[in-house]
């Protein structure tokens, strides 16, 4: 085993989450502005985001399978980070839509090798302690909030072309942190567990959970793809936009710290359905009240429920639903179908509906309706997910 001793892996995990989500702090909020600065229409932006996001459908499961068969998840993370950086370098050059599509698609495909393995690695070192996971995961939120603020300053001071360079520096930091982590030994997986994985995917509770998460992720697409353009059109500066996004992530950080206690006191179904309902209200506020800084700030605070608590619930579901030997595969499946599939469908639809800003209100209204449908699906889930049902499925 190379790298840091196991007991000292937590600082490296904290740094890895900080850098990983720091990259996303530049990539996600400001990508719409960056592409707009390159002369792309809202339809082109939506199409590019959809095609790039679609690489996340297959990527996580493919990389997870490779990591599982090799028994070396850390090597897969390192390889993914290095190759993602190489793909990202294409954004330094302005040669039109197709080069951006190729470069960002390569970046996204290799980027998907990182997070599922990082989540599994984290739970391994924490002995499946979800409360400690939430605290370590919050370092990613800190990275996101810091880089959103830095991105706003870069945007206002140097323009959109400065953003790719900031993200590249964070990728180098991520690569360094991954080389500090110790390698994991391959988990023991018996043949019954291998056969049981397929059966798990057809269980009603799993289908209901994935359907709800998929639909909710679709509703996030207008926010992720077009919020910075929306804020600019409403008259907010780049720094102000960064502050609003940072407020959302600050609420997310606070939520991660008391997430464990919340799930002990309330049912899984209640918490998740409330988060989805809150998301519906949030998109309606963006549709009709975003011109008011106060109400825009309130809608950003709702990110604590619509993302942070909902994400922690989803991670707990995956950890409890799949046995330890299959969790990497379960994490990859979740990441691919939800963030890849749901994100791609939502991004493409948002690009069509946005109409270069003319359809902004109706886009967020449709997003709210979509979140409402996700809430109805969540209400059909069991109150709690306690055991690993795969053990039953394998018999």
Question: Where are the regions that the model predicts?
Answer:
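A membrane-interface helix-boundary motif in multi-pass transporters
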Residues: 153-169, 352-371
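Structural signature of the two symmetry-related core transmembrane helices
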Residues: 75-89, 270-285
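Cytoplasmic helix-loop-helix junction between adjacent transmembrane helices
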Residues: 105-139
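Helix-to-loop junctions at the C-terminal end of transmembrane segments
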Residues: 58-72, 155, 254-267, 354-355
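Juxtamembrane intracellular "pre-TM" segments in multi-pass secondary transporters
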Residues: 2-7, 181-213
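Helix-loop junctions at membrane interfaces in 12-TM secondary transporters
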Residues: 10, 92-104, 287-299
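Helix-loop boundary and gating motifs at the non-cytosolic
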Residues: 3-53, 206-244
């Amino acid at each position: 085993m190379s790298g840091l001793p196991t007991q000292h892996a937590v600082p490296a995990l904290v740094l890895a989450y900080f850098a990983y989500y720091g990259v996303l702090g530049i990539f996600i909020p400001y990508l719409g502005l960056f592409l707009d600065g390159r002369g792309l229409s809202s339809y082109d932006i939506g199409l590019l985001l959809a095609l790039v996001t679609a690489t996340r459908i297959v990527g996580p499961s493919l990389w997870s399978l490779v990591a599982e068969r090799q028994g070396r998840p850390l090597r897969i993370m390192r390889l993914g980070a290095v190759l993602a950086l190489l793909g990202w370098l294409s954004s330094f050059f302005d040669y039109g839509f197709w080069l951006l599509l190729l470069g960002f698609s390569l970046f996204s495909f290799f980027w998907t090798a990182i997070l599922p393995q990082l989540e599994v690695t984290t739970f391994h070192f924490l002995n499946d302690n979800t409360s400690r996971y939430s605290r370590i995961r919050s370092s990613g939120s800190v990275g996101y909030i810091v880089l959103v603020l830095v991105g706003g300053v870069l945007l206002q001071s140097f323009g959109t072309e400065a953003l790719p360079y900031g993200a590249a520096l964070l990728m180098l930091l991520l690569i360094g942190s991954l080389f500090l982590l110790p390698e994991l030994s391959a988990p023991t997986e018996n043949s019954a567990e291998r056969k049981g994985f397929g059966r798990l995917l057809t269980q009603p509770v799993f289908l209901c959970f994935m359907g709800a998460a998929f639909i909710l992720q679709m509703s996030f697409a207008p926010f992720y793809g077009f919020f910075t353009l929306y804020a600019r059109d409403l008259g907010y500066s780049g720094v102000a936009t960064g502050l609003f996004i940072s407020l959302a992530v600050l609420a997310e950080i606070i939520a991660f710290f008391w997430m464990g206690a919340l799930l002990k006191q309330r049912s899984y179904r209640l918490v998740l359905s409330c988060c989805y309902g809150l998301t519906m209200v949030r998109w309606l506020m963006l549709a009709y009240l975003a011109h008011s800084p106060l109400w825009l700030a309130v809608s950003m605070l709702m990110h604590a429920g619509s993302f942070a608590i909902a994400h922690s619930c989803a991670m707990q579901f995956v950890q409890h639903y799949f046995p330890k030997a299959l969790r990497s595969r379960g994490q990859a499946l979740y990441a691919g179908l939800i963030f890849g599939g749901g994100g791609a469908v939502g991004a493409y639809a948002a690009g069509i509906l946005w109409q270069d800003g003319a359809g902004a209100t109706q886009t967020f209204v449709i997003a709210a309706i979509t979140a409402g449908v996700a809430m109805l699906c969540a209400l059909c889930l069991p109150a709690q997910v306690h055991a690993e049902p795969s053990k039953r499925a394998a018999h």
